[in-house]
Amino acid sequence: MEKNSVNKAIRNAIKRGEINSVKELIGSNKTILHTMTSFGSWLHIAAKKGQMEIVEYLVHKGIDVNIKGDIFDASPLRVAAGEGYVEIVQYLIQSGVKLDVSSAKRNPLFAAIYGGHKEVVEHLVDQGIDISVQYTGENIEDMDAYRYAKEFGQIEIAEYLKRKLNEKVQKRVLKD
C-alpha cells in the first residue's frame, strides 16, 4: 500500500474507532506512527474524534503528547479540550502533557471556553493552568480567560473563572 493510501486508511480507522485496524496499519513502523498530516499527528486526530482507546494506544506506542500540529500548531490537548473530551484531557495531563499558554490559539483553556465545555475548563483550572495570562492578537486585546468567556457568551464559565480569579487574588493578599 502506498503512503497516501496508508495514511488515509489510518485516518479513517481512527475516525471510526477501529483500534484493531489502527494497530494493524501502524504495526511496529515508527515512521508511520510519527506521520504528520495536515490534520496533525494521529494523536491529534484521535483526540479530535474522541477515540480514547486509540489515544491510549498511540501514547503507549510512543507518540509525544506535546507534539504540535493541526491548524493551530497546537497540542492534542488543545484539540481534545476544544471538542469537550474531558477523559482524553485528563489522560493527556496524566501522561505529562504541558499546559501550553504561549498563545491564545494554543491555549487548551481558551479552546474549551470557545466550545462551551465547562467540565474541561474546571479540570484545566484544577490542574493549574494560568487563567490570568492575557493575549493580544487578531481579534482580542489584553484578554484573559474570564474576558474571553464573556466575549463569547459563555456566562456560566465566565462566572466560574471570575470566582477562581478572585480566590487567586485573596490567596495572594493573605500570603503577603
Locations of regions flagged by a protein language model:
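Ankyrin-repeat-protein effector appendages
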Residues: 1-9, 95, 127, 141-176
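N-terminal segments that cap or nucleate solenoid repeat domains
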Residues: 2-45
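Ankyrin-repeat boundary/"N-cap" motif
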Residues: 4-10, 35-42, 68-75, 102-108, ...
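Conserved ankyrin/ankyrin-like repeat signature
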Residues: 21, 53-54, 87-88, 119-120, ...
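Ankyrin repeat domain, specifically the short helix-to-loop turn at the C-terminus of the second helix
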Residues: 24-31, 56-64, 90-98, 123-130, ...
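Alpha-helical adaptor scaffolds
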Residues: 68-90
